[in-house]
A protein has these predicted regions:
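N-terminal regions immediately upstream of nucleotidyltransferase
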Residues: 2-35
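Conserved catalytic core of two-metal-ion nucleotidyltransferases
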Residues: 79-141, 160-167, 181
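Active-site nucleotide-donor binding segment shared across nucleotidyl transfer reactions
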Residues: 27-66, 71-77
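Conserved aromatic-histidine-acidic binding/catalytic patches
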Residues: 14, 18, 76, 80, ...
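Glycine- and acidic
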Residues: 6-12, 71, 175-177
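Long, low-complexity intrinsically disordered regions
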Residues: 143-149
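Residues at beta-strand starts and edge strands
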Residues: 64-66, 101-103, 186
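Conserved nucleotidyltransferase catalytic core and NTase-mimicking acidic/glycine-rich helix/loop elements
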Residues: 149-407
């Protein structure tokens, strides 16, 4: 195959030019390496023209994920196909890095039937309105049912906030393996998605960070009036996050110092330490507010996990968890499912455990660790596990079973 050479765009519209060039390259590679692909669809921030791309002397850094849906036949084994596409994405990413573009590429298989079955949720809404089909004879985006964003259930916002909390745990576990810019982007994304989540019940949701940011003051005022206890610095931190999201080169040169992984120290030198320190408080305030609303009472403050999902969702969640579990631990996991079923679904329990562990003040205390050991859906929980062990287990379950699923 002809070796592809990366060329730096010379225009001021760096992100748009990089997105167009890389999308065309990925499309060619996927079509050649995976001929069973029936269509390729660009999703996420790149499709919304909101990719976070920084030009540095040594490299171009694509900090947000570059995400594609690879449409396959309904008869495909999605699990095996996913493994093949993961390898292909890694190969393409490695080739791009060798040409001066640091990027994380995701190729996710999507059976043809998937699109017609999409129900109202945030990803489906943005896919319908912002997704871009790169190639394919059938327009699969037209198959997505049309729905108003007001029909998106509140638990979608709760799911978004919960996923960002788990990613904060992931960041704390991997902090010494990520660059300053990668860490800062993870924090940035969390701030922006807290606004996304609140914009849904506030009646100001729109498919794009720029539109939601424009309504930020009204959304935050509404949230405070509704009892969501946000830190006083949240608005200022949100504005920092938005600036970095769309313009990571302007005032953030300190993030590109080689060999440094201590983001809190770097932020303190720049007078931005509260951007890091106050995020857990803000995220937990929003999480508890949504949990309370969904549970119908202030269960987030009680000993039992908040009951945010109905019984049918618990049944579906536990069934899928047991179905996809490894054979050896399946029996003890089934016994644990019986004990934990009254307390919630695997999703709600993982989210509740993640929220406990993410608390910077109480997360590592003995009673919090005991609580997480009690409710985390593991086959054989370790009653003496420390914070790191439990956080790693929580993140592992989320990655394997919950991250890309609604079950």
């Amino acid at each position: 195959m002809r070796r592809w050479r990366w060329k730096m765009p010379a225009t001021s519209t760096l992100a748009a030019d990089v997105t167009q060039t890389v999308t065309a390259h990925v499309a060619g590679r996927v079509a050649q390496a995976f001929p069973r692909c029936r269509a390729l669809i660009l999703t996420g921030s790149a499709a919304r023209q909101e990719a976070t791309i920084a030009r540095r002397p040594e490299c171009v850094y694509w900090l947000s994920d570059l995400e594609f849906l690879v449409v396959v036949s309904d008869s495909e084994n999605v699990g095996l196909t996913g493994e093949v596409l993961d390898e292909l994405a890694a190969t393409i990413g490695k080739d791009l890095r060798s040409q001066g573009l640091h990027i994380k590429l995701e190729l996710t298989p999507a059976p043809e039937r998937y699109f017609a079955r999409i129900r109202p949720h945030l990803f489906g809404y943005e896919l319908k309105r912002c997704g871009r089909q790169v190639f394919g004879d059938v327009n699969y985006l037209d198959r997505i049912p049309s729905f108003d964003w007001r029909s998106i259930p509140l638990d979608e916002a709760f799911r978004l906030v919960s996923n960002r909390l788990i990613e904060l745990l992931e960041l704390r576990l991997e902090q010494d393996r990520r660059s300053l810019a990668e860490q800062f982007y993870a924090v940035t994304k969390t701030y922006l998605d807290l606004l996304t989540a609140l914009s849904l019940p506030a009646g100001s949701y729109a498919p794009g960070y720029q539109a939601r940011f424009g309504a930020r003051r009204a959304v935050l005022q509404w949230a405070v009036e509704q009892g969501c206890s946000l830190p006083a610095s949240f608005l200022g931190n949100l504005e920092i996050a938005f600036q970095f999201k769309l313009d990571p080169d302007s005032r953030f040169h300190f993030l590109w110092v080689n060999g440094q992984q201590d983001l809190p120290a770097a932020l303190e030198r720049e007078g931005l330490r509260c951007f890091w320190d106050e995020l857990p408080e803000a995220a937990l305030a929003v999480w508890r507010w949504f949990a309370s609303r969904l549970a119908g009472r202030s269960e987030s403050c009680q000993e039992d996990p908040p009951h945010v999902y109905p019984v049918w969702a618990r049944l579906r969640g536990w069934s899928r968890l047991l179905l996809h579990a490894d054979p050896i631990p399946r029996l003890p996991l089934a016994a644990r499912a019986v004990r934990l079923f009254p307390h919630g679904s695997p999703r709600s329990l993982v989210y509740s455990c993640g929220a406990r562990l993410a608390d910077p003040h109480a997360g590592a205390k003995e009673d919090s660790l005991a609580w997480v050991s009690r409710f985390l859906p593991l086959p054989t929980p370790n009653r003496h596990a420390d914070w790191r062990e439990l956080a790693e287990a929580c993140v592992s379950i989320w990655r394997r079973h919950l991250r890309h699923s609604h079950a």
